[in-house]
Amino acid sequence: MTMWLCRAGRFGEYENKFIEDGCIYCTWDNLDVALTNFKSRQDLQDYFVSKNDETKVKTAMNWASQVWPFGNEMAVGEIVALPSKINSVIHFGRITGEYEFNADAPNPFYHRRSIDWFALNVPRSCFDQDILYSFGAFMTICRIKQEKRVVKAIEAFQNHGPSAPSGDDAHESSDGAIDIEAEALSAIAQRMIQKVKGHDLARIVD
């Protein structure tokens, strides 16, 4: 079973649209060309370089490694994880449609895949720390390599509600580097919520 991480914008600004539309989008800015037009990942990389003279080859390689799978590797039936930047939860969906390109869509929603969101608002606390590191990968789109453990945690949440993670050690995480800042901020926020309530928390936010 293949599982993908797909973010809803750098700051989670498209999260509600992803959920409400029942879709995931490849939200690369001004990428108004069908991904299936490129015969290889290298062709996509070359396109990024040619479109902007200031784009370095390594940067284009990074972008292509994320964008290419959306149009050419993801498949119907595979699972997508959407980490929320609004709340400390993760949404999970199953891909139900092939890659679609709409040249008339508003930027950056040219590229989409339909999704059945079968598990919304699964608390981060349901997952072991190494899995959370996977969800914190510093990439917009990448593979998640702990599929079985993730699915097991989702099923446990759906059947019994939040429970303590197993604490099993594992070395595989994801195809991307970890967004340490995002994970640290999430941990700090959770600690504050546990320690401070009501108006005291409001004063801290102010």
What positions do the PLM features span?
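Mixed-charge, low-complexity intrinsically disordered regions
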Residues: 1-2, 6-8
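Mixed-charge (Asp/Glu-Lys/Arg
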Residues: 3, 13-14, 18-59, 64-74, ...
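Conserved tryptophan-centered aromatic signature that marks the ligand-binding surface of SH3
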Residues: 89
